[in-house]
UniProtKB/Swiss-Prot annotation:
Gene: Hyd-5
CDD domains tied to this protein: hydrophobin_I (cd23507)
Name of the protein in question: Class I hydrophobin 5
Glycosylated residues in this chain: 96
Disulphide bridges: 33-93, 40-87, 41-74, 94-107
Organism this protein belongs to: Flammulina velutipes
Length: 112
């Protein structure tokens, strides 16, 4: 009886003392975005690059206000097996796609 009580106590102590990672956010699974939507962009560039900066200026957007990369001529990636389910160019997750398919802001690469 005494050994069973000791075993329960030791097991509870070991369980409570097991180190756990705190504050670490796991990466999203391949093909998923933490924020924004998946896009297939013909080109992904830094906001300060000439083509991206030119389009941003035409839209009245300050280059310094853009975080992440800029996707040019992007289309949404839909469910697997759909018409737009694959991407032969640059698959990215973008935060701001409110400019049609011309430009997407805040893009990060994603694996499909």
């Amino acid at each position: 009886m005494f050994s069973a009580a000791i075993s329960v106590f030791v097991l509870a102590t070991l369980t409570a003392a097991t180190p756990m990672a705190r504050g670490i956010i796991p990466a999203p699974p391949a093909g998923q975005c933490n924020v924004g939507t998946q896009q297939c962009c013909n080109s992904v560039q830094d906001a300060s690059s000439d083509p991206a900066a030119g389009l941003l200026a035409l839209l009245g957007i300050n280059v310094q206000d853009v975080t992440g990369q800029v996707g040019l001529t992007c289309n949404p990636i839909t469910v697997i097996g759909g018409v737009n389910s694959n991407c032969d160019a640059s698959p990215v997750c973008c935060e701001n796609n409110s400019f049609g398919s011309l430009i997407s802001l805040g893009c990060v690469p994603v694996s499909l």
